């Protein structure tokens, strides 16, 4: 078997295709969660915390600020060390939501698997030789003792 044939068999196996589909859907789902956090959750948190707070603009200057710059973009362009904790909080919330959804999906899949395992299998039909032996046994039991 040539290496090309081996690769073809490897690439078209069900698990590889399932993995590819999972990666594609995961990438799209990640964008949905990112939008949920950035466009819905963080603005709600901003309103709850008093309004006017944009977490992506929360930072601490770590060092000299020679021109007394105030915006994050200007500080980063000037090469000033900046600790952008607001961006980290946004990404952390994004991760927690994504991890929670994955946890719920795995839990649902495991529950469905358990239900399939718990379903009793239909008893296998008794083989003909065993049935015949049982008939003989029953006949011998019912036979009058001599």
Curated annotation (Swiss-Prot):
This protein's encoding gene: mscL
GO MF term list: mechanosensitive monoatomic ion channel activity
Organism of origin: Acinetobacter baylyi (strain ATCC 33305 / BD413 / ADP1)
Protein family: Belongs to the MscL family.
Superkingdom of origin organism: Bacteria
Pfam families according to UniProt: MscL
GO CC term (a single one): plasma membrane
SUPFAM superfamilies hit by this protein: Gated mechanosensitive channel (SSF81330)
Main location: membrane
Protein's name according to its UniProt entry: Large-conductance mechanosensitive channel
Subunit structure: Homopentamer.
Keyword line: Cell inner membrane, Cell membrane, Ion channel, Ion transport, Membrane, Transmembrane, Transmembrane helix, Transport
Topology of this chain in the membrane: Multi-pass membrane protein
């Amino acid at each position: 078997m040539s290496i090309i044939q081996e690769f073809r068999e490897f690439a078209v196996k069900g698990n590889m295709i399932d993995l590819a589909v999972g990666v594609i859907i995961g990438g799209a789902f990640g964008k949905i969660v990112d939008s949920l956090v950035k466009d819905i959750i963080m603005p709600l948190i901003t309103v709850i915390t008093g309004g006017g707070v944009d977490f992506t603009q929360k930072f601490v200057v770590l060092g000299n600020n020679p021109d007394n710059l105030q915006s994050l973009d200007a500080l980063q362009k000037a090469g000033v060390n900046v600790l952008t904790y607001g961006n980290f909080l946004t990404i952390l919330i994004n991760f927690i939501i994504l991890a929670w959804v994955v946890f719920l999906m795995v839990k649902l899949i495991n529950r469905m698997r358990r239900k399939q395992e718990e379903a009793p299998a239909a008893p296998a039909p008794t083989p003909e030789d065993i049935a015949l032996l049982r008939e003989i046994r029953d006949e011998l039991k019912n036979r009058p003792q001599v």
